[in-house]
């Protein structure tokens, strides 16, 4: 269950102009409190091959792009520690920190919050890098 502004976040709460969200996950793994800050898209563009009967007269166009909803309800982070903890039955608190309207805004807020919380300096956070440029110094 995702929490946003103190309430359960359901699919009908996804805004029309929403692109994705920034989340914070928290759990107790092996007796230690851990947290993770990340981002997740509501939708993805998926390229699909056209069937022969659907091909236009211009044969160069062989694929089309469609939007696909992500199943964020069942998402438990890209972090392996949290994925394993979830499979082992550990309760993970999943909170949406901010909903963003564009890819740029999503990356900006993820990066900003990771620096503000000091995820690379703190042992409590599981984040190993920020933007793939700044790495864990623990």
Label the predicted regions:
Residues 2, 7, 21, 34, ...:
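Intrinsically disordered, low-complexity segments enriched in small/polar residues
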Residues 31, 40-41, 78-79, 127-134:
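Glycine-centered flexibility motif
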Residues 40-103:
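Conserved short loop/helix modules at catalytic or binding sites
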Residues 1-17, 92, 97-138:
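Boundary/linker segments flanking structured domains
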Residues 1-49, 138:
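GIY-YIG nuclease catalytic motif and its immediate N-terminal context
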């Amino acid at each position: 269950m995702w929490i946003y502004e103190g309430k359960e976040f359901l699919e009908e709460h996804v805004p029309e102009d929403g692109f994705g969200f920034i989340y914070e996950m928290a759990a107790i793994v092996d007796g230690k409190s851990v947290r993770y800050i990340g981002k997740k898209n509501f939708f993805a563009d998926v390229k699909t091959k056209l069937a022969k009967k659907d091909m236009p007269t211009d044969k160069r166009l062989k694929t089309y792009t469609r939007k696909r909803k992500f199943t964020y309800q069942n998402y438990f982070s890209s972090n392996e520690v949290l994925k394993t903890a979830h499979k082992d039955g550990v309760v993970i608190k999943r909170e949406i920190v901010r909903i963003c309207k564009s890819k740029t805004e999503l990356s900006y807020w993820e990066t900003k919050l990771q620096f503000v919380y000091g995820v690379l300096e703190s042992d409590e956070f599981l984040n190993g890098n920020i933007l793939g440029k700044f790495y864990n110094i623990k």
